[in-house]
Amino acid sequence: MKKKLYISLTLNILFLLIIAGLLVYGLRKGMNRDTIRLKSLVNPDQVLTVNDRVYKTRHSIFYSLEKPSEKHQIIFLGDSITQNCPWSELLDNQNIINRGISGDTTSGIRDRLSNIVYLQPKKIFIMAGINDFSLGRSVKQVTSNYEKIVRHIRRESSQTEVYIQSTLPINNKLNKYATTPAQITDLDKNLELFSKREGVVYINLYPSFVDSTGHLKVQYTFDGTHLNGKGYLLWKSKIEKYIRD
């Protein structure tokens, strides 16, 4: 009888030690208060962004800013490709606000739209989608998110002019990503059709940046995904007329 009791106690102790070990491991891997608290701001399925300190920092800053006194801003909305550019300097327009966040997705943009539309901006230029594909989302899912983004803007800020910029190509030879040229071109086709249906301005940047193999031209990038200075100058030349109008 004592032997059975001893075995039972031993097994229970081992079980508790295993559970404790797993909890310690989880805490070391980032299961902390910041991650839990962030769920009130960011959709939990944003795997790339929830664990990204840069994302959390920029997101919290945007939510902390008071409404600027200057109305009718021009907003650039997107991921790191948008964030990396000093748009107000590039386009010589101090009325431009950069709301790009590294690692963001179309779902992430949907979650933070309230922080955008409350500004009642004059124009919004949107580009996103590459990070969605990295999360395994389909072209259909990304298109659907775009549609919801545009309709949300129109519902909450009806005077805002929306500009959808085509998704730029990437260069798999440099970045080794699994995203294919076909995913990008299929998304761009969907966005162009949607823009025509909804009366949204569609800016087709893709042909200017793509090479003969369907990849981002090497002269416009260092890592195969993000643009360098020459790339942003080319982008500027394609959109500056929409800024002036």
Regions inferred by a protein language model and the residue ranges of each:
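General small-molecule cofactor/ligand-binding pocket signal
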Residues: 97, 163, 201-203
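A short helix->loop->beta-strand "cap" motif at the edges of active sites that frequently abuts
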Residues: 157-161
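Conserved SGNH/GDSL esterase-like catalytic core that processes O-acyl groups on lipids
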Residues: 41-148, 176, 182
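Hydrophobic positions in alpha-helices of CheY-like receiver
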Residues: 149-153
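Catalytic His-Asp segment of secreted/periplasmic serine-dependent ester chemistry enzymes
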Residues: 27, 169-245
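N-terminal secretory targeting modules
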Residues: 1-73, 87, 244
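Feature marks short, surface-exposed loop/turn motifs that line or immediately flank catalytic pockets
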Residues: 105, 132-134, 168-171, 209
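Alpha/beta-hydrolase-fold catalytic nucleophile elbow
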Residues: 127, 165-166
